[in-house]
């Protein structure tokens, strides 16, 4: 089943623009659904890297979006894959 890591590109500072990454690894087959969320709502503008595969033929992909952290906003990454019973959400 997929492994999910959510992290910012730069050390987070409230009010300072940053990039939020959702790195998903160890999945097969390659079809996967990745959504990034702000306060539970889907962020519409998310960019995806090309799908790549590791030596063991499992796949990995990076989703990322621009964001500006604040004290109150909650960010997360939600992943759905055929190997999972239900989507998994990982909070930042």
Curated annotation (Swiss-Prot):
Keywords: Disulfide bond, Immunity, Immunoglobulin domain, MHC I, Secreted
SMART domains assigned to the protein according to its UniProt record, in alphabetical order: IGc1 (SM00407)
PROSITE patterns xref list: IG_LIKE, IG_MHC
Presence of keyword Disulfide bond: yes
Domain Ig-like C1-type, first and last residues per copy: 2-89
InterPro entries xref list: B2Microglobulin, Ig-like_dom, Ig-like_dom_sf, Ig-like_fold, Ig/MHC_CS, Ig_C1-set, MHC/Immunoglobulin
Gene Ontology CC annotations of this record: extracellular region; MHC class I protein complex
Disulfide bridge positions per record: 22-77
Localization per record: Secreted
Keyword Secreted: yes
GO process annotations (BP): antigen processing and presentation of peptide antigen via MHC class I; immune response
Major localization class: secreted
Family: Belongs to the beta-2-microglobulin family.
Quaternary structure and interacting proteins, as annotated: Heterodimer of an alpha chain and a beta chain. Beta-2-microglobulin is the beta-chain of major histocompatibility complex class I molecules.
Known function: Component of the class I major histocompatibility complex (MHC). Involved in the presentation of peptide antigens to the immune system.
UniProt-recorded name of the protein: Beta-2-microglobulin
Organism: Mus spretus
């Amino acid at each position: 089943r997929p492994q999910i890591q959510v992290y910012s590109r730069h050390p987070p500072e409230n009010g300072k623009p940053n990039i939020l990454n959702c790195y998903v690894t160890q999945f097969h087959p390659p079809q996967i659904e990745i959504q990034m969320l702000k306060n539970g709502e889907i962020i519409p503008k998310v960019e995806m890297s090309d799908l790549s595969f590791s030596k063991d033929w499992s796949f990995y992909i990076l989703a990322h979006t621009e964001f500006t952290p604040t004290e109150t906003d909650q960010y997360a990454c939600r992943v759905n894959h055929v190997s999972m019973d239900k989507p998994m959400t990982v909070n930042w």
